[in-house]
Design a protein with these regions (language model features):
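Noncatalytic luminal/extracellular "stalk/propeptide" segments of secretory-pathway proteins
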Residues: 43, 47-181
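Short helix-loop-beta-strand segments that form the rim/entrance of peptidase-like active sites
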Residues: 40, 321-347
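Metal-dependent peptidase/peptidase-like ectodomains
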Residues: 102-104, 118, 123, 142, ...
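Soluble metallo-hydrolase cores and metallopeptidase-like ectodomains found primarily
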Residues: 22-24, 114-138, 222, 227-306, ...
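N-terminal capping segment at the start of a domain
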Residues: 22-56, 82, 92, 220-229, ...
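Bacterial Sec-dependent N-terminal signal peptides
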Residues: 1-21
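Active-site-adjacent substrate-binding region
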Residues: 183-195, 199-202, 206-207, 212, ...
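Structural recognition of the beta-strand scaffold that forms the well-ordered cores
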Residues: 41-44, 79, 127, 148-152, ...
Length: 390
C-alpha cells in the first residue's frame, strides 16, 4: 500500500479512450488493493535473489527473473547487453577477536574485496594515526607490514541524534555534538595532511604491506553501515559494525595490541557481460513514440538491495503488469528500463541512450523512481521542456 500513490500517478498518466480517467484510476486502485503482486515480487527479488551488485551472479539472476515475470504477464522483454564488468561473488565472512580476549565480531567484506582464502588471516591490528604532514604518515606506513589497519574514524556514540535529543540533558547533548565535530575535523584534517585522497589512501596502505583493512562507515542509524567497494587489489577490506570497530580502536589506542582472525572468502569470475532489462507494450496508434518507466536494478550488496533501488524496481514491474491487464493496447509504446550499474556511474542508462537514439529521441514522457521506502512526498520534473507543468 505504500506504493499505491506512485502506481496510481504513473498509471493514470495514460489516456484510455474506452474509459473516463476516473474509471481508469478506480480500476487501478481496485487492482492494487485487491490483487497487488508487490509483496510477492519483493519477496522473490529481495529475499530469494537478494542484493544485485553489478558483475555478480545475483545481478544476472535478477535480470533473468524479471524477463520471466514479464513473459508470464504477456509482456515482451529482453536483456540489453551493454558492456563488461568485473565478475565477483561474495562468500562467507567471519571475524574473531583473538587477543586480548575471545569474541566473535560482526562484519562483512566490502564489494569486490580480495579473498583471504579458506584458512583466513590472523594478525595484530593497528590504526591510521593523526599526522601533521606527509613525512609523518610515510614514517608510519613503514610499521604496517603484516598487520590489519583500521582505516575509518572512531565514532564517539552509536546512538542517533534523535535519541540523544529525547533522553539526554541539553548540556550533555551539546557537549557530545561539540566533541564529535572537533574529532571529525581533526580526523579529516589529518587525512589531508597524509597527502593522499580518500580513494587512494587504501592503496598506499596496501602497498606498504598491510595484510588487510578494517572499515566502518556508520550511517548514523542503529546497526546500519554503508558498505561500498573495497578499494584494494590484493588484500581484503572488511566492514565491522560500529560497536565492534570502536572496541578494536580503543584497544589499539590503549596499546593492548589486539589480534584478530579474518576469514573473508570471495570468487573472481573474470570479465562478465552486463545488462539492462527492457520490457515493452507495443503502441497501436503511434508505436514509434514512447512513454518510459525507469528504475535502476542494481544495488550495493552490503544489505538486501531493497531501499536502493529494489522498491523502485518492483513498482515499475507492478505498473507494467497492471498496464498490460487494464490497458493492453496503448496509443504509444510503453517501455520499462531496469538499468544495470547505476551505482557505479549511471552506466546502464547511459549505454541505453547511446545504443538506442531512435527511441530516446521519441520519448514523450519518462517516469523514474529511486526514492526508497515510505510514502511519496514529492514529484520533481526535469529533462523535458515544460515537464514541471505536468
Amino acid at each position: 500500500m505504500k506504493k499505491l500513490v506512485t502506481l496510481t500517478l504513473i498509471l493514470s498518466s495514460f489516456l484510455v479512450f474506452s474509459q473516463t480517467t476516473k474509471e481508469f484510476v478506480d480500476n487501478v486502485v481496485n487492482e492494487v488493493e485487491s490483487n497487488s503482486k508487490l509483496e510477492q515480487l519483493a519477496h522473490e527479488l529481495f529475499d530469494v535473489i537478494g542484493p544485485r551488485l553489478v558483475g555478480t551472479p545475483q545481478m544476472k539472476q535478477a535480470h533473468d527473473w524479471a524477463i520471466k515475470k514479464y513473459e508470464s504477464w504477456g509482456i515482451e522483454a529482453y536483456n540489453h547487453e551493454w558492456g563488461k564488468w568485473r565478475g565477483w561473488e561474495r562468500g562467507v565472512t567471519h571475524v574473531d577477536l583473538i587477543e586480548p580476549r575471545l569474541r566473535t565480531l560482526v562484519g562483512r567484506q566490502l564489494a569486490w574485496s580480495p579473498s583471504t582464502g579458506k584458512k583466513g588471516l590472523q594478525a595484530e591490528v593497528t590504526k591510521i594515526p593523526l599526522v601533521e604532514n606527509k613525512d609523518q604518515f610515510s614514517e608510519w606506513l613503514e610499521t604496517v607490514k603484516g598487520k590489519f589497519v583500521l582505516v575509518s574514524q572512531k565514532e564517539i556514540t552509536g546512538r542517533t541524534d534523535s535519541q540523544w535529543e529525547e533522553y539526554a540533558t541539553e548540556e550533555s547533548f551539546e557537549k557530545m555534538k561539540k566533541t564529535r565535530d572537533e574529532l571529525t575535523d581533526q580526523w579529516y584534517n589529518s587525512l589531508r595532511n597524509t597527502g593522499y585522497g580518500y580513494r587512494d589512501i587504501n592503496s598506499a596502505i596496501e602497498d606498504a604491506g598491510a595484510v588487510g583493512l578494517i572499515s566502518s562507515r556508520w550511517s548514523k542509524a542503529f546497526g546500519a553501515n554503508k558498505v561500498f567497494s573495497a578499494g584494494t587489489e590484493k588484500i581484503p577490506n572488511v566492514d565491522l559494525n560500529l560497536e565492534d570497530y570502536t572496541m578494536l580502536y580503543r584497544l589499539v589506542e590503549n596499546n593492548q595490541k589486539p589480534v584478530i582472525k579474518v576469514i573473508a572468502t570471495s570468487k573472481e569470475h573474470g570479465d562478465v557481460p552486463t545488462f539492462n532489462t527492457i520490457g515493452m507494450i507495443k503502441g497501436v496508434e503511434k508505436p514509434e513514440e514512447y512513454v518510459m518507466l525507469s528504475a535502476h536494478f542494481d544495488s550495493w550488496d552490503g544489505g538486501q538491495g531493497t531501499t536502493d533501488n529494489g522498491t523502485g524496481s518492483i513498482v515499475m514491474l507492478e505498473a507494467m503488469r497492471i498496464l498490460k491487464k487494464l490497458y493492453p493496447n496503448p496509443k504509444r509504446t510503453i517501455m520499462v528500463g531496469h538499468w544495470g550499474s547505476e551505482e557505479q556511474g549511471l552506466n546502464g542508462s547511459r549505454a541505453f541512450v547511446e545504443d538506442y537514439p531512435e527511441i530516446v529521441d521519441n520519448i514523450q514522457a519518462l517516469f523514474n523512481q529511486d526514492n526508497g521506502t515510505g510514502r511519496v512526498v514529492d514529484l520533481s520534473g526535469s529533462g523535458f521542456l515544460h515537464s514541471y507543468d505536468y
